[in-house]
Amino acid sequence: MTEENSSITAETVASHGLSPEEYDTIKQALGRTPNLVELGIFSAMWSEHCSYKSSRKHLRELPTTGSQVICGPGENAGVVDIGDGQAAIFKMESHNHPSYIEPYQGAATGVGGILRDVFTMGARPVANLNALRFGSPKHPKTPHLVSGVVAGIGGYGNCVGVPTVGGEVNFHPAYDGNNLVNAMTVGVAETNKIFYSAASGAGNPIVYVGSKTGRDGIHGATMASADFGKDAEEKRPTVQVGDPFSEKLLIEACLELMASDAIVAIQDMGAAGLTSSAVEMASKGEVGIELDMDMVPCREEGMTPYEMMLSESQERMLMVLKPGREAEAEAIFKKWELDFAIIGRVTDSKHMVLTWKGDIVCDIPLAPLADNAPCYDRPWVATPKAKALGAVPASGSITDNLVTLVGSPDLASRRWIWEQYDNMVGADTVQCPGGDAAVVRVHGTEKALAMSVDVTPRYCRADPEEGGKQAVAECYRNITAVGALPLASTDCLNFGNPERPEIMGQIVGAIKGIGEACRALDMPIVSGNVSLYNETRQDDGSSLAILPTPTIGGVGLLQDWRDSTTIAFKNTGEEIYLVGNSGQGHLGQSIWLREIAGREEGTAPSVDLAQEKATGDFIRAMIQDGMLCAVHDISDGGLAVALAEMALAGNIGATVEAHDKAIAEHAYYFGEDQGRYLVSSTNAVALVSAAEKAGIPVFRLGVTGGDAVVLNSQSVSLEKLRKSHEAFLPELMQ
């Protein structure tokens, strides 16, 4: 066997992100010293991004099965039964590191990559969502990152013809050196037309389709598995470049071929490119794979096998076809003006063999690359319990506080962002951004899918386990609030350096909380992603890690899209009720505490999962019975902010003259106690009666009407609230 470069030094190994111990393991697995091609392949497959070597042990604790689950983690995306022979297919992934280095392309290719994960399974993508985290609004780089990321998401999603229907955006100094871009795609497929990635059939042709391979994105997976230093800007060549028009052609070509029975297995080329797609297909099928690198379509001259295998050029797929179907498949891809090349064959060797110019340049047993990749039980320490907050004095009037909060970075309107996204393409969007969850009709039916992405990082910092539970619970509430039954979830776990025991403790705690909530709320994790090393080395040698950010994406089902509810008050005279516990006025880790009192401390609010489930079941039943006019979950900013958002959405004021006298007024209105909904109804007697029968607490708060929000006789006009609410992002982006 020839070696593309036999001079493997300690520096070469380190530059590939491998430890000396890992390099020794590679030599033992091969029984020899690897050449550069093989080293690069091991580097990519053993990167944190591909192998999950620090989190895999703990991810096994998550619930992944259920009566509704057709396919859980391990494939390109999760698959959930939605009835009538149809399935929802969805996943969320991160593109954090690339989006900090080159925000437009990083975010755009994040969207492209998650789209491919979904349509690879045979689904037509119907919706995109995103969860974004940026640094302090005062940081000089923040406007640049916001502008680039939003433009990248919109530019790619709009061109490819998939609506961007929801998401969330937060700002915090902990993200100054590492912004987060988590992208989620939801698709719909027929349950008898779902495609998987396990290769089979020795001798079957392996086909490369899509765009040509270039040098963009080489070592992208390795770069995404390390923290940043001062050289972050120099890593631009590791960021992929996307072409949404090619992606659109690829979607249509793949779905057209999928209508036949020509495909044995299919895998998109995502992180680690051709390396990961080839290894995953062969290892899942327990077969071997042989590739002729001379046949790989390249857009740049003189590309080597090392570059071809590690390139992360976008809009590419790998397929195993049934023998004799090559011409049929080629005709389809040529019609769509895409590359099509037979680059290899399935073997029974359980090795990955690469040839180039007549020589073997790689021969690796597949087991060490995939199933036997490193899995670490890293040392961890539990996050210390936060100190209880105690009483916090009021500061200013309730209404002045409300005006400040609705205009604050984490609660201000996101209109500037979502107006750059096409959220109606496809003509099936029922609820656009701005509510609790997006709602998209299942084309040609009365059914609809509801979807939301959620996490509260400040809670996770204070208590990772409780924060993990709350992320799932809030996603559950948001989906419930539009009338849908939550079915399943996907996660995107964003943390700092797992080699630091305190960070590993955050990971362990969050996963434990997520698992507990998913089991209690019957929202199994069916797909997901882990993004670690989200921290930046400071001038003094210390590291700034992001807040622990375990994002949860959920999907729910409405049997009839016309039954969905919104947050907007509909008419004057609707009675306003709080459904769920009255709350304890929990101000620890709240937006009020940060924005009004200037403090970030205290315990995270606790989540009662049994009560969460019972209250959610009640809310859905009331929506189904037509008892509720508007529904909104109470989360960031507490009851008063939820009330203001409902009033602004419907352009109808509200008067509330009730609060628990045992709780300070500001704590009552701005406390972030969990498991609660704000609703309006024109059938209050029946609502209260049903709640009593179900054992669900309800509290009458007031009535809709007028052009102001009135809290205990303190009034603020909708005009003043709206002016504050709409100002933040346009002013930031001037």
From Swiss-Prot:
Pathway the protein takes part in: Purine metabolism; IMP biosynthesis via de novo pathway; 5-amino-1-(5-phospho-D-ribosyl)imidazole from N(2)-formyl-N(1)-(5-phospho-D-ribosyl)glycinamide: step 1/2
Pfam families registered for this protein in UniProt: AIRS, AIRS_C, FGAR-AT_linker
Binding site for ATP: Y52, K91, D491, G528
CDD domains assigned: PurL_repeat1, PurL_repeat2
UniProt keywords, alphabetically: ATP-binding, Cytoplasm, Ligase, Magnesium, Metal-binding, Nucleotide-binding, Purine biosynthesis
List of residues binding substrate: S94, H95, N96, H97, R116, Q240, E312, S313, Q314, S531
Compartments where found: Cytoplasm
Active-site residues, as the UniProt record annotates them: H49, H95 (proton acceptor)
Record field: catalytic activity: N(2)-formyl-N(1)-(5-phospho-beta-D-ribosyl)glycinamide + L-glutamine + ATP + H2O = 2-formamido-N(1)-(5-O-phospho-beta-D-ribosyl)acetamidine + L-glutamate + ADP + phosphate + H(+)
Entry EC number(s): 6.3.5.3
UniProt: Mg(2+) 2 binding residues: D117, D268
Entry keyword Calcium: no
Cellular component annotations (GO), alphabetically ordered: cytoplasm
Principal cellular location given in the protein's record: cytoplasm
GO terms of molecular function: ATP binding; magnesium ion binding; phosphoribosylformylglycinamidine synthase activity
NCBIfam families: FGAM_synth_II, PRK01213.1
Function: Part of the phosphoribosylformylglycinamidine synthase complex involved in the purines biosynthetic pathway. Catalyzes the ATP-dependent conversion of formylglycinamide ribonucleotide (FGAR) and glutamine to yield formylglycinamidine ribonucleotide (FGAM) and glutamate. The FGAM synthase complex is composed of three subunits. PurQ produces an ammonia molecule by converting glutamine to glutamate. PurL transfers the ammonia molecule to FGAR to form FGAM in an ATP-dependent manner.
PANTHER family (alphabetical): PHOSPHORIBOSYLFORMYLGLYCINAMIDINE SYNTHASE SUBUNIT PURL
UniProt similarity note: Belongs to the FGAMS family.
Complex and partners: Monomer. Part of the FGAM synthase complex composed of 1 PurL, 1 PurQ and 2 PurS subunits.
Name of protein: Phosphoribosylformylglycinamidine synthase subunit PurL
Organism: Zymomonas mobilis subsp. mobilis (strain ATCC 31821 / ZM4 / CP4)
Annotated gene: purL
